[in-house]
């Protein structure tokens, strides 16, 4: 690859985390989120129906995690520095525990990988971030693995 972007200093950043951020989950926020995405599932907006379900009460839609931002670690990419063009390379989600009203969810993102490849427009860098969503009991509720493409 002629135009190498990643250098040793760039690669040393892998594993760094942004500051954790904690959110208090409110019943009204769950209802408004479900309404905004057009999801009428009673688990998300009807306490009585949800109480009768195997969940035993209201829960948040799995995608509710997207409403909880997380500071990402600053990433400096060799020759690109912090100014570059980029694309969203997609996300993979795993869900483990439902999120409930009253939960305190701590969100933290870490730089999981930096990888360089050659594209039609020249060298590209794939940045992989992993975000965890953990409740007040230390239980992992969800993980997100997202990829950004910089060139």
Describe the predicted segments one by one.
Residues 1-11, 97-151:
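HotDog/MaoC-like acyl-thioester-processing domains
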Residues 2-90:
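Hot-dog-fold acyl-thioester-processing enzymes
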Residues 88-94, 148:
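A beta-strand/beta-hairpin structural motif
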